[in-house]
Amino acid sequence: NQRKMVDSINKNDILFAIGPAGTGKTYTAVALAVRALRNKEIKRIILTRPAVEAGENLGFLPGDLKEKVDPYLRPLYDALDDMIPAEKLKGYLENRTIEVAPLAFMRGRTLDNCFVILDEAQNATDMQLKMFLTRMGPTAKFIVTGDLTQVDLPKKNQSGLSTAIKILDNISGIDIVYLTGSDVVRHKLVRRILEAYGDLNNN
């Protein structure tokens, strides 16, 4: 199904990749963005994720904004580290060819001539996801990744991701790819763990 992601983004401008931890959805999305940058199909990569997760609010974290935000964005940096030599990546980040920022920073912008990845989108509210998707400029590609079994939003907030995949399913140019436990690319035990928790949740 990672192959489906590759085929889909070649044909569509917005791709939702939905699946459990370890299925390589974020890694594949970042690889596709790096490929597009190398092929000069786009000028910039923007990686973002909601910065409120697991009950933590940025207001309660110590340090300046970069220090506060970076722990949330670490998995995106990790994927980039695997694909781009350290010095080159440093240069890209400094000249903003690659930007890694929390979702709130997308408000009011038009994201054009770039490849944009929203990771952990299950933790975006309806309003946040609508705000994000409507930032899209005419020559942008968007990949939205998420796992609907790992929603960290307060109970009163429904995941914007579950709403989006229901209401946007039949729009031309938008595709939804579902990854499953069989797509897990981490240690073989990860799939077994996910299956065990799935059994627990179903009982």
State where each predicted segment sits.
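Conserved helicase motor core of SF1/SF2 NTP-dependent helicases
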Residues: 2-18, 22-23, 27-118, 122-203
